[in-house]
Amino acid sequence: MNELSSYLRRTLCEAWRNGYGEEARRAAIVAPLLTLVGFAAAWFFPQLTDHVMGVLEQAIDSAGLSSTAETKDMAAAIFANNLTAAFSAILWGLVPFAYLAAFPLGFNFFLIGALGAYYVRSGSSLGVYLVGILPHGIFELPALVLFCAAGLYLCSRVTARVRGDKEVRILRTLSEVSTLFLYVILPLLAAAALMETYVTPRLLAMVL
């Protein structure tokens, strides 16, 4: 156990120094700003939210996240859906120059803000909306920031290598990102899925 802890600390600290820390800080700063932009956009252009809600409902149904699903199936579906999103965002980092992981970061936090405006305009309180997202969001939102930052970090390293930086070791970077995924992001997503399935609905039932 001590050896594992030492390995994790050493690997994650190295990734942080090599640029992951910068990407994570940047993502953490941009995320709340995008949420505010999403809220403002949906507040002043409500037709935008109506379209987004239609797309979101279709995505929920296709992912097996409908309210009619069994509880255990719901937890598994939420975890699988978030796991796929995280894995995809990180893999996109293998494409140099594009920084594709910025898209899920921007879209998801913009959507959180837009949905907040939608519920407030529909007559619900912002407090009820926060009760619906914060219990699992305290795990899921940091995971979202971390895995998008991992994709951006991987892209920056691949880009540097393509540009001729011989000091960048892609295999080492992949090892860093894999360690982060397995020992930090994965547990956060698992906790988020359990909270969203078993805790959030009960809290919502208390305030609705």
Feature-to-residue mapping (PLM):
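Interfacial helix-loop-helix junctions of multi-pass membrane proteins
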Residues: Y119-G137, A193-L208
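Transmembrane alpha-helix/helix-exit interface in multi-pass inner-membrane proteins
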Residues: W43, Q47, G93-A117
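Cytosolic juxtamembrane amphipathic/interface segments immediately preceding
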Residues: L8-R25, A89, K166-L174
